[in-house]
Amino acid sequence: MNSAFASNDLSILMLSSAGQLDRRPDSRDGGISTNMSKRKSFDVEGLGHANPIPAVSRIGNIVATGGVSGTDTSTGKIPDDVAAQCARMFANLRTILGAAGATPEDVIRVTVWIARPEIRAEVNKEWVVMFPDPHSRPARHTMFYDHFAGSMVVQCEAWAVIDIAAGHV
C-alpha cells in the first residue's frame, strides 16, 4: 500500500489549479493550512433573502449562488409577467455572480425551477441572450416546482469556476 494513502494519514490530497497535488492537513486532526481557502459570503442590495442566506458564496475560484428570482430590484417586487420574470432572473444572476467576482462566462452549471411547462420557452429566450455561444454554454437542468411564493414562477441557481490564471480574482 502506498504510504501517502495510509488510512491513519489525516491529510487530504488536493488538486491545485495548476494540476499539481497539494498535501493539506485534514481539519479532523486540528491542522491548519494557510493555503486552504475560506468561504466568503456576499449579499446583493435588492436581492436579499428573508432567511439568513447570502446571495452568493465563494471558496477560492468556486462560486455558488443561492436561489435567484426575477425580483425587480428597483421596486422589490416580482413582475406578474413571465417574460419579465425570466429577463430579471438572468439580469439578477449576472449581478449576483459579479458580487463574487464571476461572470456568465465562468458559469459551469445552472439549475432552473419553473412552475409550468410553458415557462421553459421564456427561460430559453433569455438563456441564449446570456449564453449566446452554442459551443460554450453551461450545463442546465430544468425542474418543475409548485411551491413558489406569491407570483414567482421561475427561479435558478448557478455554479461558476473563476479562471484565476486569466487574472480574474
Region annotations inferred by a language model:
Residues M1-S7, S11, S16-S17, R24:
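Low-acidity, Ser/Thr- and Arg-rich intrinsically disordered low-complexity segments
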Residues L10-L13, D26-A91, T95-I108, I114-V169:
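N-terminal presequence-like segments and the immediate start of the first folded domain
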